[in-house]
């Protein structure tokens, strides 16, 4: 950005905001998704213990768990855009030039018409309609898609994908590694939500490692 600051017409204030955003997008979002994935998978295994071997050995299944976590918990619950020109949506709604459009990503990702009657629940075995991303719109789409999507969540596998040469993402590898060394909730020190925000963040998530005595 510094090399092209003049060409792009970026002010110093715009540069500062972009740098701050990169720190948020590149670290905070991944750390938050990491804890949420651990929580969802631990909860899933409590009711589906038969999947424990898959968590340990099948990286593609773990990646599916990551995608399901991200679907339920987009880093930002909304997306906001300003219309640069008049546009008519497929539904027939007209959006005038200059209008601010707010997309409720969390509700879109939990639409039962798209994701089934249990759309609000964690289910890594969820069947998906053709053309629907397993993580919904959590990474946005089109020209605004998150540039860190493949790095964090990996490439969406297709039938016949081999885990040996598949980019499964940083979250998949780190979550599987922690689960394989026996991460579990601390029974005497339960996790707590962050009371300083309305968003569903964990404020504390104490864990233990190794098998229970």
Where do the language-model regions lie?
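A structural signal for well-ordered alpha-helical segments within the folded catalytic domains
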Residues: 32, 60-63, 133, 137, ...
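Cytochrome P450 heme-binding "Cys pocket" and the immediately downstream C-terminal segment
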Residues: 149-197
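Conserved cytochrome P450 K-helix/beta-meander segment immediately N-terminal to the heme-binding cysteine loop
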Residues: 104-131, 139, 144, 151
